């Protein structure tokens, strides 16, 4: 089944800005997150949304996607728990240079130490876990050197021999006719797969590979203030190096589960709090939830719906450096839908005492609305 266009998945245009991409992702992820949406297919929809955001939120991946579209999973845009990083490279150009120049100067020693592959792990965090951080233990499937043969691939007591086909070089010369004449092309030796070694008696544990897949438990300290889509490198926790080379690294990518009440923008938090029209008119003090605990907020008399109050220092700790963001409280005045006769009479009496007048600010709003209708 063909993948949908990432821009279509997020419901945005191809010219969308980074902020528009982020807003679209937050809206959709909140709508389809499996912890919130229990409908059939919500989980797959959420994965599709997350994949689209992972690519389009990264300028380099987005540019590659805009140019080439969906590519083979082994050649980029990798992801998922424990999934490795890989790149497409320039193999096509290398083949051309190999053909005309015989691959001269690019041959590498097959026995030289090489760094192991990097790994990627996706960690899902609750909203408050991302705000305050946490200590976590994760399990990573990765390739490690075989303990039985110590990575040689040979049966204990034996050693790998030099490949008899390539002489230990890991490559062989192949003559090829081209429009420019006969050239010599270097190809990876198919008998030793480029290792330059030949194993007569293979290790019974790894079957000659020298590596086995193991599940490793790793402790990860999630820093306070981490945001959705950010990643953290755990040095040396990738796959084992080859020929004594260093291990690769592990990259932990954070996916923050949207909260049903708190909304985050950078290190600030936004919430909507309902108040009654009586509280808005006469003023009051209300309790407002924050990630740091309950806070008492004074509502001045005459507060209008949409008014925003700032609670300083009640947001998200800065990931780099000291300080904390703020929480913005947006009040929504709730008008009662059902009133009994006595309540209606009280309101009518109130209206008669005011003469149905509106204050200057409200008058100004209606004047602007009238001018808009007239086209002034």
Curated annotation (Swiss-Prot):
Names of required cofactors: Zn(2+)
Keywords for the protein's UniProt record, in alphabetical order: Chaperone, Cytoplasm, DNA replication, Metal-binding, Repeat, Stress response, Zinc, Zinc-finger
Pfam short name (any one): DnaJ_C
Cofactor note: Binds 2 Zn(2+) ions per monomer.
Main localisation: cytoplasm
Chain ranges of zinc fingers (CR-type): 133-215
Keyword Methyltransferase attributed: no
Single annotated GO MF: ATP binding
Binding site for Zn(2+) 2: 163, 166, 189, 192
GO biological process entries: chaperone cofactor-dependent protein refolding; DNA replication; protein refolding; response to heat
One Gene Ontology cellular component: cytoplasm
Matching PROSITE patterns: DNAJ_1 (PS00636), DNAJ_2 (PS50076), ZF_CR (PS51188)
Annotated positions binding Zn(2+) 1: 146, 149, 203, 206
Domain of life: Bacteria
CXXCXGXG motif repeats: 146-153, 163-170, 189-196, 203-210
UniProt domain J: residue ranges: 5-69
Locations listed in the record: Cytoplasm
Domain observations: The J domain is necessary and sufficient to stimulate DnaK ATPase activity. Zinc center 1 plays an important role in the autonomous, DnaK-independent chaperone activity of DnaJ. Zinc center 2 is essential for interaction with DnaK and for DnaJ activity.
Family the entry assigns: Belongs to the DnaJ family.
Assembly information from the UniProt record: Homodimer.
Function: Participates actively in the response to hyperosmotic and heat shock by preventing the aggregation of stress-denatured proteins and by disaggregating proteins, also in an autonomous, DnaK-independent fashion. Unfolded proteins bind initially to DnaJ; upon interaction with the DnaJ-bound protein, DnaK hydrolyzes its bound ATP, resulting in the formation of a stable complex. GrpE releases ADP from DnaK; ATP binding to DnaK triggers the release of the substrate protein, thus completing the reaction cycle.
Protein name: Chaperone protein DnaJ
Originating species: Listeria welshimeri serovar 6b (strain ATCC 35897 / DSM 20650 / CCUG 15529 / CIP 8149 / NCTC 11857 / SLCC 5334 / V8)
